[in-house]
């Protein structure tokens, strides 16, 4: 075993790099006394919840105001001096110290992007110092469960400039025995879908998350396309592969109504609409079916269809334990989307997942629409045995990087590797 001093933080560096949308983001590097290095890059969302932790942006004219040099300076001038000399193995203390220094409810002083970059880079440095893969360092010897991928193959809403209000239409290959087999099935359907779109004269241009962004008139039209693509690829909808939606309802919720597909719907009407979709399509998961502060509506939605499908709170919970506790108390959902940059530290992310599990909720580890080559969430999904991961479509290398990392983990685990499959989905299979 190395001496304790070997795990002490020596220096922390940071820089401004670009994400998959060409927008600036923060990269941090944590250097330990033993020579180990950890590097992490934070992602950024397009449809962001009002209650998310605060991203620090520069404003001004450079990069259309989206620069992050101020966040980089916060790391160099404030975070690094405070953390140098501390043990990288004490992740909780490091994260809590950054939260304390920030001193705001939403991390608006130091910025969640600067805090998270250091938090994740520190975990990487510690795992490298111990010569452990990140999933093993963050997890335990039983961390061998590969997640079911929720693959966003048709993009709409804030992720694509087409006529679809629903933001994501996803494939969920669950009825197989291995992650690699699930990935193969999803990939084959993705290419089947592309051929279908070409034959119908529809665009095969892709959106932010690598899914296609055709001009379609309704969610039903997208659902029908996916069913046809699944069957043409030789699979059975609802058996090997099901569907999932991210409605991102907050994006079109105005003045108490859901402005959806040319209609103005009440909360009750939106619930009826979603219930009909579940009856007509093999949907196993719906994310953000209602707006982030429509708490009464969420409880009604959960009562209506929560025993049939997974109801995932993204903007509703923003990976925040306070909002999650309220959701548990009010029975507002049965699942939480986990985005590390919504809350801003690894420790708080893990706390949210623990709370969700204690309440019988599922957790879905998720990317953001503005992603990078960083693969931390792949390791996190295995470390926590989450059972599900959202990391985009089967194109764009920032999405594929996570899938490839999971393939390597599966190979590394060998005979010990398990695939979540049907048991990874909620609520009826929890």
Curated annotation (Swiss-Prot):
Its EC number is 4.2.1.11. Its cofactor is Mg(2+). It is found in: Cytoplasm; Secreted; Cell surface. It comes from the Bacteria. The keyword Secreted applies. The active site is at residues 209, 339. The keyword Magnesium applies. Binds a second Mg(2+) ion via substrate during catalysis. GO terms for biological process: glycolytic process. NCBIfam families: eno. Belongs to the enolase family. Catalyzes the reversible conversion of 2-phosphoglycerate (2-PG) into phosphoenolpyruvate (PEP). It is essential for the degradation of carbohydrates via glycolysis. This is Enolase.
